[in-house]
Amino acid sequence: MMHFSFRHTSLADIDFYIECFRNDEFQYMLYHNDPINVNNLERYIVKNDKDIKFVGSIIDESGNLKDVGFAHFYFKEENAYTYVGGIHPKYFNHGYGVYASIAMLSLIYDLMPNIKISTGIYKHNLRSLKSDLAIGFTIIKETNEKWILELTKENFNNNFVGRVKLKIKYQLSNI
């Protein structure tokens, strides 16, 4: 069984975020619409308002850290959030992306069952589109450069997600 541990971001994560920001492509992909850089990163990490920001760890059966990532849910309107997330470039993608997404989204829906979550996927990233559609996202809009997808709890509770949930354990940690 794969173990996922999530916690709210704090200033203890500053080095993790600085490492992420050293990767130009990674920084652009996640934050090109936000005026965030290393200079105001501390304020960004601790300023949550209605946003929800998590750092997640994937731990194997022996207790070894396998992957580190983050997921940010930006408040749009009541019961609606926009989601961005990523894996730390240093540990980039051991093949756990779908498992991590399902663990994170399961936790979010446990905490806030009525929310809708949207995200955008660039058209060159067909692999991400395929996995998000399997999770239950549906395409609600298309632009020249990307698809906009939305997820509800009803669509998330599908057979594929159910099978994956049997293979994972997730928790919210205070650490």
Task: Describe the function of each predicted region.
Residues 25-44:
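Conserved GNAT-fold acetyl-CoA-binding loop/helix
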Residues 20, 29, 44-47, 167:
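Residues that form generic nucleotide/phosphate-binding pockets
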Residues 45-57:
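A short helix-loop-beta-strand connector motif used in the catalytic cores of GNAT acetyltransferases and
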Residues 1-16, 20-23, 53, 60-175:
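Acyl-donor (CoA/ACP) binding surface of acyl/acetyltransferases
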